[in-house]
UniProtKB/Swiss-Prot annotation:
InterPro entries: AP-1-like, bZIP, bZIP_sf, Hap4_TF_heteromerisation. Belongs to the bZIP family. YAP subfamily. This is AP-1-like transcription factor YAP7. Keywords: Activator, DNA-binding, Nucleus, Transcription, Transcription regulation. Residues 1-144 are annotated as: Disordered. One of 8 closely related fungi-specific YAP proteins (YAP1 to YAP8), which all seem to be transcription activators of the environmental stress response and metabolism control pathways and to have similar but not identical DNA binding specificities. Present with 1700 molecules/cell in log phase SD medium. GO terms for molecular function: DNA-binding transcription factor activity; sequence-specific DNA binding; transcription cis-regulatory region binding. Gene3D superfamilies: 1.20.5.170. Residues 74-94 have a biased composition (Polar residues). The gene is YAP7. Residues 130-149 are annotated as: Basic motif.
């Protein structure tokens, strides 16, 4: 014969949730034994009691994604805390060893200082004199560089002044040429206007033809008067005179 399986219905009534930094332990109670009839009394107290302290996640920085699992985060935190503890312990050990070494070195330095005070004073004086000499040399070199630089700049300035003077002379020469050409242009324009006005008069005047073979050396009227010589008297016959009368 088959055995009947008993089914137990459990009612859960959680308590109020509390917020805190530590997770609380879950307190559970064992369920009551199942009744042979399969009926459960719901009027009695709750069989399971849950109590859990919820922990709020830390506020994330902008641009970072939240972690998917809290278990991984807690494990990482535990591991990082362990690593930090180991590092701090190692640092403490290193500091103690360094302190011991420094104390030993100070002891040796004190002995060596006591032994070489005289030589140290001499070395200090030499180092001061050497430093002063180096400073004097550096200042002298700086002054020389400054004077050479000033000379170079003065030469450049003088060259630029000469160049400016040349361009000014060229400008004045071109300006005078421009003014002369402008005057000549105005004169030629005025002459052209006069010729245009006289053109219709020239066209309407009759054309006079000049002789084809003009004399090579034309004689002026004054020369003709000066070179004039009177002719001698001519005797006329009486019969001719009467006829004329």
């Amino acid at each position: 014969m088959r055995q009947r399986r008993s089914v137990v219905a459990v009612s859960v009534k959680p308590k109020g949730f509390k917020l805190g930094h530590k997770q609380g332990s879950m307190s559970t109670t064992s369920p009551p034994p199942s009744s042979p009839d399969g009926n459960v009394s719901t009027s009695g107290p709750s069989a399971i009691k849950l109590s859990k302290n919820w922990e709020l996640p830390q506020r994330l920085k902008p641009g970072r994604k939240p972690k998917s699992k809290r278990g991984d985060a807690s494990a990482n935190n535990d591991g990082s805390s362990k690593i930090k503890k180991v590092q701090t312990s190692n640092q403490k050990d290193q500091m103690t060893t360094k302190d011991h070494e420094n104390e030993g070195a100070k002891g040796h330095e004190g002995k060596s200082d006591d032994e070489g005070n005289g030589s140290g004073d001499e070395n200090g004086v030499d180092s001061v004199e050497k430093r002063r000499r180096q400073n004097r040399d550096a200042q002298r070199a700086y002054r020389e560089r400054r004077t050479t630089r000033i000379q170079v700049l003065e030469e450049k300035v003088e060259m630029l002044h000469n160049l400016v003077d040349d361009w000014q002379r060229k400008y004045k020469l071109l300006e005078s040429e421009f003014s002369d050409t402008k005057e000549n242009l105005q004169k030629s324009i005025a002459l052209n206007n006069e010729l245009q006005k006289a053109l219709p008069l020239i066209v309407n005047t009759p054309f006079q033809q000049q002789p084809e073979n003009p004399p090579d050396n034309p004689i002026s009227i004054l020369e003709m008067v000066e070179n004039f010589k009177p002719i001698g008297a001519v005797s006329l016959k009486k019969g001719k005179l009467k006829a004329h009368c």
